[in-house]
């Protein structure tokens, strides 16, 4: 089993996008720090040839410029919030619309548009935690939201 992190490319704002690779005898998983994207999952087909089973793009800029969120973490929320508003306790929270007056997948600054911090974690599994924060007020959302996505690969498969 192995795990590594290397540079993948640059975002349109000039930030370095990292590529984390987790690998065992059966599977290779590649993850990007931009939007915690699952970039590739490579497994062997029935003839033993490696094949990538994930749809994706070749460059960091391609992921950033395409709005389909392919392979990306989605949040604070997923799906559509009608009218870009919702009740919270005794108030109506107004968030930024991004699709015909609605808010889809957390709007323009959701986790699918966020640079995550990626780190290596030693241990029995190949593991790469990715962390990001959505500060209070992001697209109108209340409160800070801290997210950690733990991507792990054991000796025989994904965890």
Language-model regions: role of each:
Residues 1-159:
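Surface-exposed acidic/polar loop and edge beta-strand patches at domain peripheries
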